[in-house]
Each structure stands twice: as structure tokens, then as C-alpha cells.
Amino acid sequence: MDVNIFHFLFTKTNPGENFSCPKCKILIYDFDKVSEVYQCKNGSWACKNCWIEIFRTTKECPTKECRVESIDSLSRSRFIENGFAGKNMDCPNSLVRSNPNHYEGINVLLDDDGCRDVVTVGNLSSHLKGCIYAFTKCPNDVNGCTGEFRLKNLDQHLQTCGFQLEDCPNCNNKIIRKSIEEHIDEECLKTKIKCLECGSTVERGDMDFHLDNVCPNIVIPCILCDNGCDLLFKRSELSNHLQSIEHISNLNNKIDELNETLNDLQISELNQKVEQLETLLTQARDDPLAQREINRLISKQEKFKSVWDIKNFSKRQFQKGFYFSSPVITVGHHSFHLWLYPNGETSPSNSLSLYLVLTKGEKTFVNFSISIKNHNGNDLNSTFENDKCLEVGGTRWGWAFEKDFKTGGYLKNDTLSIQFTVAIKKQPLITDILSVQ
């Protein structure tokens, strides 16, 4: 508090001349209490700060009547201190502050709504601690309120303060009072809004999911677009589309195209192997080195290695038991498929299950492995090291994974990529063939 305020607060005469330090001319009041006053043996007095300056410089009392060396050569002037402490004064909170940061004389006026108590200087500090007319900032200043009020009026202000925090009636988040309508109309995730496509009412926070997975009027691709059906239609028409002739025709055309491409590749590869074997066979009977090379080639497993991409994986809804079937995997005279159950086959958990199934050919033994691509570098790998027996309509072999494949780096452009290798059991060595000729 600025000490100049006391020139305006004393109820009767201005005591400044009697209770101002004769050396520095400052009123003997230090913030919230009467300043310490000391006097020399001749009765000459001054405030403590001035005596400290005297000890450092002249070492003479203010009237220059005696020499002083230290505070120990002085005594407290209780007469001056007590006389000042007993003076009556108006409470500082009787004033209006046109500039709330200072109590300069030119900026203070009496306030009809101010404190009317008269107190002594000595009791001023304790009075101010409980004075309900003291000025205080609104506790909502951290939220932007710049108001300053007397304590007695603060509760009334808080009832209407636009920066008071309130619970949103929809989401229960704390929102400042003056912004709560804007929050509800434009931001609140629990506010129900109307879908512009179908007119149904959905919480704002669920609208993206509604549009991506539920809204019947959104145009979507066929769930088998990766397998050749490129038609677009409203989600509400999906069931009818899956039963349509055009959809089935698209799939059949794609299957025929893939089979033709696959057969061309396999025939080309087999022709190369046949040419190598024919060349070696002409030399094998008389050349041991050539015979060993033939054994090496034939002892290799017939195998197929590829990547199966499932697009739009996260945007699809899967019921328990639904599965994707990979394009045909042809190894030798055998045809296989991978079956992927996104939500498991029969397990009550939401594990992803993946099986290798023999769909054409005689009973055979295979080695196979898979790797589910992770774009963060943590591929999920699994391998059946030993030969597994498969037959059409019989045993399947596979895995179940307790992971969320829609997150964690397994999707890129919303596509799940599965690398796989299927190998048929080893064939007899050429030495066995030659031995029976």
C-alpha cells in the first residue's frame, strides 16, 4: 500500500509534520505497521533506515548535538511510535480507486459503498485482514474475467460472471458460461445433430463413424471390389447387389482373368525347368556331376510365394464367421486358398483367424508360412516348420492372432497385406528314378 494514502485518511488534522521522520520526511509507517523509531541520548529521533545511513556516514544525530556509533547507543522512541499508533484513521477501503494499481492522492475519492469504520493506525493491519470492503479480483481471471470488486459484492458477481465454469448439459465438460451455447451448437461431441445424407439423428462425435459404416445413403464400393467387382451403389442396396447377376458376373470374369494369368506364369516356369532337366538328363547317365545337379533341382520343394492384399479393411463391418477367401494358390497339381476370419470363426473373442485350405488335388503334405506386414517394422510372422497333411474337405491348418489389425501400423492406405509361402513335400530324387530304369 502506498504510504501517501495516509495524508488523505486521517480523520482530523494531518499528522504528517509530527510523525514524519525529521531526516527523510517520510511518514513512520512501514507497509502494514508503524516503523521502528530510535532516538539519541539528547532525544533527537529518526526512523531506523535513516540511523543506518548515519552510522555509515556522519555518525552524528540529526540535530548534530551528539555522536553515535551504532544502534546499541540508541533507544526506541516509544513515545513517538505509540503516539502515532494511537491516531484514528479511516479504513483505506472507504475510497474509490480510479486507478486500481495505486493509491496516489490524485486518484482516490470517497465511496458511498466503501467501509465506514474508523480504526487506529496500530490496528489497521488486523482490520484490513477481515474487511469485507477490500477490493479483490474475480477468481475467474484465469478464464479471462478482468473485473475487480469489493469482497462483499463478489458472490453476486459470480452468479452472473460470463467466465464462470459450468458443466455442459450434454458432455459434462467444464465450459465458461458465456461460451456454453456456442460449445453446444458447434463443438460438443455429445450434441445430437442430423445426418445430411439420411436425416437420422446422431451424436456429433459419432457422425464420421455413421457416415463411414452405417448411413444407408452413402455411395460405397462393393465389399469384393478387390476381387473384380467395381460397381458403386448406396449402402442400403448392398444386400440386393450381392445377389445380382451383374455382381456375380464381375467376380467370375475376374477369377477367370486371374487364373489365366496364373496359368501362364506357371507354364512358363515349368517349361524352363523341363528344358533344364532334359539337358541334364542327356548327360546324367555318364556324368556324375550332372546327376547330382538333377538331384539338387528335383529335391527342391515345389512352392508358391505371393502377397494377398485386402483393401478397405477398416471400413468394413464383419459378423462372426464371415471370411475372406484369397485368389487361388496353385502349386503343382494342387489348388489352395487362404481363408481369413476378421473376427474369428467360432471363438467368442475378436481374434483374427487365418487358415490354409486345400480346394483341389490329392491329399498332400505341405510346409507353409505367413507374414502380416507391419509398416512400423514389426511384421507378424508365423511358420509351420513340419509337414502338415491337407486334403479337400478335411483338415485345415492356421493361426489365431489376438491383435487389433485396424491400428498399430498394419494398414497402409487401408490395406492389409499378407505375405505367404506354400511348399509341397519333397519329390523322389533322380537317383531313385534312374535305378528303376
UniProtKB/Swiss-Prot annotation:
The keyword Metal-binding applies. GO terms for cellular component: cytoplasm. Induction: Up-regulated by Pseudomonas aeruginosa, PAO1 strain and down-regulated by PA14 strain infection. Keywords: Coiled coil, Cytoplasm, Metal-binding, Repeat, Zinc, Zinc-finger. CDD domains: MATH (cd00121). Residues 240-287 form a coiled coil. GO terms for molecular function: zinc ion binding. Residues 303-422 form the MATH domain. It is found in: Cytoplasm. Gene3D superfamilies: Apoptosis, Tumor Necrosis Factor Receptor Associated Protein 2, Chain A, Zinc/RING finger domain, C3HC4 (zinc finger). It holds the Pfam family MATH_2. It comes from the Eukaryota. A zinc finger (TRAF-type) spans 126-181, 182-239. The MATH/TRAF domain binds to receptor cytoplasmic domains. Belongs to the TNF receptor-associated factor family. Probable adapter protein and signal transducer that links members of the tumor necrosis factor receptor family to different signaling pathways by association with the receptor cytoplasmic domain and kinases. This is TNF receptor-associated factor family protein DDB_G0293202. It comes from Dictyostelium discoideum. The lineage of its organism: Eukaryota, Amoebozoa, Evosea, Eumycetozoa, Dictyostelia.
